[in-house]
Amino acid sequence: MLRDELLRSKNDEIARCLLSRKRKLSELYFATVGFAGATENAPTNALYHQKEQTFLDANDLTKGRYFNEATLPPFPDFAALIPRPEEQHSSLEITEPVVQTDDVSSVIAPKAEGAVRGIAPSFQQQEGQTAQVIEQRLVEDSLKKDDARIHQQPALATTSEIPQVANSPTTPAQPDQLPQKASFAVPDTPPTSTSHESVDASVSPALKGLPPSEVAPPRAVSNQLPSAQRKPESRPSLVLAQPSEDQPLSPASSAGPYSNNTPAPVAVSPDTSPAEEVTEGADEVALSPKRVGPVQLQPGLVPSTPDEQLQLEAAQSLQQNALASKSIGDVTTASSLSNEVIKEDVGPTPSAAADSSKETQDQTSTSVEAPEPKRPDGVVVAPEESQPPAQSIQEETQSQVGAEVKVVASTTPAGKKPTAAAVLPAQPERMTTRVSSGAIRHKSVSEILGETPKPSAVQPEKAHAIEKPADMVRAPASASPESAAKMRLKDRKAREKERSKLSTVVFPKQQQQQQQQQEKDDSLDIVRQYAGELARLNEEQDYLFTLFQNKAYAPPRGTNLSTLLASAHKTLTTSNHLLEYQEQMDCRTLRRIYALQNANRWPLRQLKRSVEPPRQGTHWDVLLDHMKWMRTDYREERKWKIAAAKSCADWCAEYVNSDPEHRALLRVPCRIPSKFEKKEAHASSMISPPEETTEEMLVVSQPTPDLIPSAEDESVSDGFNDEIRHDIRDTVAPAAIFSLGSDEFTFSLDMTPAAQKLLDELPIYTPVKIAPGANVPMFEQPPDSAWKTELLPVSKYASGRIKFHETESPRKRSRYDYSQYDSNPEHGMLDLPPEQTNVALFRPENKPIRDRIHPGHSFRPPTEYPMPSVGFFESRQSSQWTYAEDDELRRLVKEYSYNWSLISSCLTPSSQFTSGAERRTPWECFERWVGLEGLPADMSKTQYFRAYHQRIETAQRTVLAQQQAAQQQQQQQQQQQQQGGNNSGQAQPPIRRRTTQPVRVDRRRSSKHLALLDAMRKLAKKRETMLQKQQHASHLASLRKVNDANQPKPPISSPAEFSRLKYDRELKLQERQEQYRQQMIAQQRANLAAQRAGQIPSQQPMMNAPPGRTPNGIPHNPGTPGIPGATPNGMHNGMPNALPNGIPPGMGVSQGRPHMQGVPAGGPPMNGPIPPNPMAMKMMPQTGMPQGPGGRPGMPMQTSPDNTRVMREANRLQEQQRILQSRQQQPQPPQHQQPQAQQAQQQFHNQQQFGPQGSHSPNMNLPNVNGTPNNPAMMAAIQAGSGMQSPSLHNAMPQGVSTPSPRMGQPNLLSGGVVPTISSIQSQIQRSNPNMPPEQVNKLATDRLHQYQQQRMSQVAMNAAAGNMASVQANYQVPHDGNFQSPQPGMNGTPGMQVPQSQGFSPMMRVPQPAQQNRMGVGNSPAMNVALPQQSRSATPQTQRSGSAQAGPVPGSSKSPHPPQAQIPSG
């Protein structure tokens, strides 16, 4: 369907073109063989139609036949068509009383009229050939009759090109009335003639070939022809108004045929050269002799102007096809174009002649598309002469628009008289129209097609040869001093030069064509829609466009816009939400409409209107159309008349207020034609034109040069060749019609191809045209188009479209609306004019001067800012530049002349957040510009730019080195991973080489909004985290406050109470020590007895493993002279890493062995039944066994004062009783610590931890059990690490615990190792008794723990006394926790002596130890295992306990006056 519509439109267009061509051919045929009565709708005979149809068929384009001039019929015999002289005389008598002309005028008139009569048939000819034949015949006839009366005017010459200045003998006597300006009278018109013919004599195309002097008076001959003899197809000739002699020339018409004060009528065609003037009473037409180039030249004559050359060539080419051998017709290059332009200068005249000075009815022929047939000017139709003057005005209005002839009658600025000389084809045709004919967009045709203001005095070379003699005559007057009139004329000349420039007007398509194209497009859009194709989706074509956008940008599974707005991170106002809500409402409505349309339930959905044949136009339609056209035409004509009257009044005022000298410049010379000459002209016009053609041509060729005065002839001939160049330069530009002033209502235009193109593009307002063949009106729009639309407008929504306006209706601004929150601030900006106009700084027209005075375009860097450092160039992120930004940078640099600060501000984005990719600092812009354009050669060598380039290059090298290092490191890591077989699943991407210089990108990824949102999200999360922490801390603080308030504080004990507690504790300690002493004595006795008997206890294999299993271990041979003398390698190999930090590796095992009571230092080795873990047996160190240097082969002697005093005290107190020693050094029993001194133990829990950290057993605080500290540095470390404050060396733990301080209120953790057990017991008690207070729970748990430990200690003591080491070990391994392990043989020495890496034997004494798995291979000395680190279960940091776990002597032992005592648990 779309294809059919396109095909139909093209076919219609072809049909219109063919119809227009056929109509123009009909007009051509009518102009060639017209007959009287045809133009008055008289019934034409069948023969005419038959011949016309034959002619049309011979040139039918549809049959492939192009136009052929040979198909035109020969011209009819005008002698048979011309009426009798009586009729002609009666038709021209109307103006005879006012004719007052000398002989020269009467001589000129017949010849001119002959030309006027002959020129009309060529009005519609494209080539003008046949018109020339008629011109030749008519002119020859008229010239033959008047040959005897011609004295000053030469006859028509076909070969003469010399300008003829018709100077009569009376010319010197009449200085104001030049002979060339011969005026003629228009005879009266009989009652049967129309006002056109009664006033206008038709202009003959023969004037084209006439010399200027003969062309000047064309009226007499035409008026002498009877109306019956004139060609019936003739167009009513136009009337020339009476010229005002004393008015100055208008700048718009100084080079044209008429001045502004002498409005010229519409001459029918540019091909014709009618200089017609209707005289009312005394109407005058002064014909200035104008140079006209004839078709044929004598061998010695050369065309004087380019236009004449063109005319000559065209005429010679046409003469080859002429029907007669001597054709005088002259055709211009624009002859085919000129038939659509009519010159019309209407001057207000009171008589009927003035009324007939309007247009002819054939404006339809002037329209661009379909001009109507036009009547030649040389033929006067009798029936047409009966038309009223008003009708003739109406008819001529159309013809003036379409074909305006430039009548060369304009006067020179020096005061030439307006001439009515015809436009001869020898020069570019000019047209002058009135300003307001209403035919062109409510403008006058003069405004659009008027002639340019070219002063003829300044531009005598304008190829108007008739004007040149007048210029020469007035030359002396122009040499007078400059006056106001001269100055005004000079101004007009300057304006004329401006108009002479080349055209810059773009010719748009005509409105009709645009409307037709728009209608075609609309119809095609409708066709596309009905054909099922998708119409263009935009707001103008589819009201469902909003719904489409909503569907396109809101996918089915996507997030709705309302949801996004609800969770937006930006601040949204009510208007933002309302906009989205309104869009939802619109989409909901459109969706419902769409659904109803698909269901055929939408009431506005209409069926396509049925195709009906268009209604034929009726007479009423034509009448209404003509009424509209006439209304517009009269309205615009009235405007033009007002403008013309104003200008004439201004000229009159200027003339009145001028002095006589200036009045002479403003005066137009003319004279009144005589009545006698008009009558003579009638008689001469009766002779047949062909009879006198040949003789007349001979006459014309010779006397022409004699008619020009020698002085003027010389001046004209001298300037002729030069004028050719000036004519080319001063050609009026067609575009000048658009720059006319308000006081210019006439305009002269050269008929050049450009001018013709301009005229063709101008839309012409014409009434409806009548088809020539069908005789039906041709409406541009169908008569019923006003109501017969595509859709029946049942509602305003049927033909209208829903449009959504972004601009809201004006409303009162709320106090909450501020200008800085306006989303579109650019709408509020006003373009204010500058306050001072005398400042040239910012005025663009002064830029060249400003640049010349202050050269601001010199190259310079942004020196107002310091040059960036090398560090910046190394660490910056590359800025990204798109192609558009590069072009904008170039433009700004050129416009703002290296003002980098201004350039930077123009390129910097408006956002406050600027990413590195959008960095547009002055130096960044400069660097980018240098990268694009490069530095000037002289600038790049300066020190400043060398430093600049050096910084950039240094930064680039640094960045490149960093990238290479990173790549090498990455490659090495990858190689290591591949060699180790540790290939990860995904390889690391290679490091991308980045640059720091500006780079060009096709599209810059705008991630600043994402980065901004990400930063906002992180900040919000950080704030939330901080808030949560604060809330949690405050919650914990509140809970602590509640617990502290509820927990009763312990009462502060008095010194007496502390003394009592101390006494009770010491008593219990003494009792326990006594019990333990007895057990130890029994054990020692049993061991001694066994040694004497040579029996090895059953536990010996466990103690001394076979040497094979314990290489380098301590031998278990009973004959071994003692452990100190044992293999030292055993010490070095067995326990090099397990010794305490303060014990050197060479120390013997014996120094760490606790000596039994009564056993000397050098006694037999302890190969007896010692349990694997000697800490399980509460042995009592014997101070009576000195440990001399001999007993310590690998231990250096300690010489510190503390050690010396300790040793001395030990020797002095050796002899004291063992019971007293044991009582003094007995550690506090656990049952005394908790129930009686709970608070004190809580305050000194850190000191309680020291004892277990120093040793695994209370009776073995140090590796050297005998109390000799080994390393003071180690003691200091132990003291600093544990914070022990005990004044005793060996009773560090009991003494520290037994001296509680009431100043410290720390929780009672007892020892580090006891906490888990107490906690478990407490949890059991709490589960069984949930209502028991915490104090009772703690007390009960401590009691239970003490009972349990007491039972175990008792069992251990009994087993030790019985010598059953295995049972001791078994008892020791009572699994109160899961960390205890049995001895592991085969590791670093005697396996039996290996102590498991778990808690100590006593839960009370368990201390957290650092997580070290170093085990010490101890031979037979159980004391060496004291330094074994233990696995920790307490909360004390292991870094704090590491030193104390491996400590040797207890710090502060030098202050203790008591020797070390055995520590025996009670009970």
From Swiss-Prot:
Which regions are flagged for Pro residues bias?
1162-1174, 1457-1467
Where is it predominantly found?
nucleus
Key word Hydrolase present: no
Region (Disordered): which ranges? 154-314, 329-402, 469-522, 970-1058, 1113-1202, 1216-1307, 1377-1467
Q: Which UniProt keywords apply?
A: Activator, Chromatin regulator, DNA damage, DNA repair, Nucleus, Transcription, Transcription regulation
Asked if rRNA processing is a keyword of the record, the answer is: no
Query: Where in this chain does the record put each HSA domain?
Result: 607-686
Question: Bias category Low complexity: which stretches?
Answer: 475-484, 970-979, 1175-1186, 1216-1226, 1233-1253
GO MF: chromatin binding
Membrane-spanning regions, if any?
A: none
Provide GO CC annotations from the record: NuA4 histone acetyltransferase complex; nucleus
Which intervals carry biased composition (Polar residues)? 155-174, 244-263, 330-339, 388-401, 1254-1271, 1428-1445
Function according to Swiss-Prot or TrEMBL:
Component of the NuA4 histone acetyltransferase complex which is involved in transcriptional activation of selected genes principally by acetylation of nucleosomal histone H4 and H2A. The NuA4 complex is also involved in DNA repair.
For this entry, the protein name equals Chromatin modification-related protein eaf1
